[in-house]
Every structure is written in structure tokens, then in C-alpha cells.
């Protein structure tokens, strides 16, 4: 499985190996008076943790401890999950570990 993910990562963009730290249910503003539900994933690369989410994803597709491939460009993130599925996410937050 790792070999498959590595081959996919080399084939295109600038993917880095990352780990899903946790996920949580959250809300986002859909319209003026309407709120939507989504799953926010916390994905860590080295000392940086990205918070990524995708509209209409209300049930988690990744679990804490999963190793994924992550490519971040601006506020967009492409994730290849542990099963090899590629999905586009929105970066909704980012944090550096203390001392970095």
C-alpha cells in the first residue's frame, strides 16, 4: 500500500506524507441564515498541522493514525487517503508546533 501511495505521489504534484491526527464535526456558513455540517480533519506534516474540510462530507472518510499524501496549494488541499482515493479539500486552518 505504501508503494502505491509513493508512486501516485511522484506522478504529479508536490505530495508529502502526512498523518491524520484527528477529525471533528463542525459547521460552516452556507448562506446568510443557513449553516452546513462538515468533517474537519487535522492532518500533520512535520511541525505543521492543516485543518481541511470538504462541503457535503458529513461522515469521516479518514481516521486518526491514517497515513495520507497531502499537497497544499493556497487554500486548496489534495489528499490521497490510505485506500488510494484522491479528494479535494479546503484548508480552513493551519498551525505550527510551538518553537517552530
Residue ranges, per PLM feature:
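Extracytoplasmic/secreted envelope proteins and their assembly/folding machinery
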Residues: 17-20, 40, 62
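Structural detector for short beta-strands of small beta-barrel domains
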Residues: 12-35, 67
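Short nucleic-acid-contacting surface segments enriched for D/E, G, S/T with interspersed K/R
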Residues: 56-74
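C-terminal partner/receptor-binding element of secreted or periplasmic proteins
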Residues: 15-20, 71-100
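OB-fold (S1/OB) nucleic-acid-binding surfaces
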Residues: 32-50
Amino acid at each position: 500500500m505504501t508503494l502505491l501511495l509513493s508512486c501516485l505521489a511522484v506522478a504529479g504534484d508536490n505530495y508529502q506524507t502526512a498523518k491524520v491526527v484527528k477529525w471533528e464535526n463542525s459547521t460552516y456558513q452556507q448562506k446568510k441564515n443557513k449553516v452546513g455540517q462538515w468533517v474537519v480533519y487535522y492532518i500533520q506534516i512535520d511541525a505543521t498541522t492543516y485543518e481541511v474540510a470538504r462541503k457535503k462530507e458529513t461522515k469521516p472518510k479518514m481516521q486518526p493514525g491514517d497515513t495520507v499524501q497531502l499537497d497544499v496549494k493556497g487554500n486548496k488541499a489534495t489528499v490521497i487517503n490510505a485506500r488510494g482515493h484522491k479528494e479535494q479539500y479546503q484548508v480552513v486552518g493551519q498551525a505550527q508546533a510551538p518553537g517552530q
